[in-house]
Amino acid sequence: TIAEYMLPALLGDFGARYPEVTIHLRVSNSEGIVSMVENNTIDLGVVEAPVGNKNLVVEMCREDHLVAIVPPNHDLANLETLEIKKLLEYPFICREEGSGTREVINEYLENNSCDTAMDISMELGSPEAVKGAVEAGMGVSVVSRATIQKELKLDTLRAINLMPKLERPFSFVHQKQKFRLRAMEELLDFARGYCEDHAEEQL
């Protein structure tokens, strides 16, 4: 989610300011990103789920707002707010195990006394696949509002706010020791400033 919807703008601005720095971007789910940071495969990760490894440094960037999505012709399409129990009466399309979105939704279900063993009709590996399946009428889902701006404008999906609301932090994660390259310190400092400057934007 993050790599597709937040990082391009951040890295574009960074590249314009530091044209001599080459950045190699890898996309994975939160579990995969944490593993790559642990193994020093990457220097800096951005994740959307809690990080259990206490040996890593985790810094929150900003809050992300998650919403229920349904196709425009769905029974729930005209609602403004919705309790998660009502949404779970319909076939549910979710991300794969290890995804930050899946982990956050499971935690939300537990906190709201819902069974995490819901009626899952599909497990898919990307936000685009989830959106496509919901658009095709194969079920309902919960996604980051940041991922559906185009679909909302085209009216191929409807977003419904969950009650209570569902938010999660986007966080940077890295090793405690200093970065091997000075450019990584500059990137992290730039990213911190970018998050502060864009904190009020709708995600």
Residue ranges and their predicted role:
Residues T1-K54, D115, L124:
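Central regulatory/effector-binding core of bacterial HTH transcription factors
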Residues I2, M6, R158-E201:
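A late-sequence structural motif
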Residues M6, L10, T22, M36, ...:
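Conserved functional loop/turn residues at catalytic and ligand-binding sites
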Residues E31-V34, I42, A49-N55, E103, ...:
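A ligand-binding cleft/hinge motif common to bilobed small-molecule-binding domains
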Residues F92-N112, L181-R182, H198-L203:
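Secondary-structure junction motif
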Residues V37, A68-I69, F172:
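Intrinsically disordered, acidic Ser/Thr/Pro-rich N-terminal transactivation domains
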Residues N53-I93, E97, R182:
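Flexible hinge/capping segments at coil-to-helix
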Residues V57-V67, D119, I148, K153-L166:
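Short beta-strand->loop
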